[in-house]
Amino acid sequence: MKISKILVLGSTGLLGNTVVRELSKNRSYHVTGTYRDPKYKQDLPCEYIYFDANNRDIRDFLSVNVGKYDYVINCIGLIKPHLTSTDIAIRVNTLLPLEVADIASYFKTRFIHITSDCVFTGNTGNYTEDDEHDMIDLYGRTKSLGEPDNCMVLRTSIIGPELHSYVSLMDWVRRNKNLTIDGYINHFWNGITTKQYSEVCQQIIDNNLYEESKFHIHSPNTVSKYELVDMFINKFNLDHTVCPHSTPGNGINRSLMTVKSLNRKLNIPGLQEQVENLD
């Protein structure tokens, strides 16, 4: 049995903590994760090495390590609540994936990079790979510019459990002390859970689906944020009540579609099933 050596960048974040946990269960993988804060490395179920994407000189680390692996999966990204510096946002969201992609190409290591639906304003919805990026805020622009042509770029939106910080929607709902929570009925979403994203990566590796191109990865159904919050409440047996709420205007619809065949091959289940399968 061939063992695939996999390096997961950003193993203690929202996405990375689930990716290393799920991939480490696969006996045909040898998984190594990276950490930035030492106090979280004990939570990793795999080997780990230190890496700080905020460092201005990341090339030495990447040049030494990337070539040791069959796959590198990037789970590092600065999300909107953590955007405190334009310089750091550019380094992490734009320059890091471009640098990893170039070094991975040199070593013939396969590089899987996640990007965001927030490159779109959400004015229309049902965006495909051919649609122009029209978001002009810092997060959207840095993510848009950080989509290399020489690796596999997966555009999606994710929900899942965090190890720390707890700023994502799901953990915000779980930790909310208010018994009544507003849920937007005119904000629409068809992303996937972090556990499902881990499954996507495994299918790409196991079924040799890797291809240097950009792909939209999404659930088969679109839900409102109101419906999504209600799923969390039911899944985790919370005492909260979600109340329908609308933002002014037409709301936000960043739902994704695809003109490519990959998403169909992945057989992603509906959102209700994905939420129920969360740990």
Please give the residue ranges for each predicted region.
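Mid/C-terminal beta-alpha module of Rossmann-like enzyme folds, strongest
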Residues: 198-203, 207-253
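NAD(P)-dependent short-chain dehydrogenase/reductase
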Residues: 136-138, 148-189, 195-196, 202
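NAD(P)H-binding glycine-rich loop region in Rossmannoid oxidoreductase-like domains
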Residues: 50-94
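C-terminal amphipathic/interface module of NAD(P)-dependent oxidoreductases
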Residues: 238-279
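Glycine-rich NAD(P)-binding loop of the Rossmann-fold in SDR/ketoreductase-type enzymes
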Residues: 88-99, 133, 141-144
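N-terminal Rossmann-fold cofactor-binding loop
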Residues: 33-40, 53
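Conserved Rossmann-fold NAD(P)-dependent oxidoreductase catalytic core, especially the SDR/UDP-sugar
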Residues: 98-134
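N-terminal Rossmann NAD(P)H-binding glycine-rich loop of SDR-like oxidoreductase domains
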Residues: 5-26
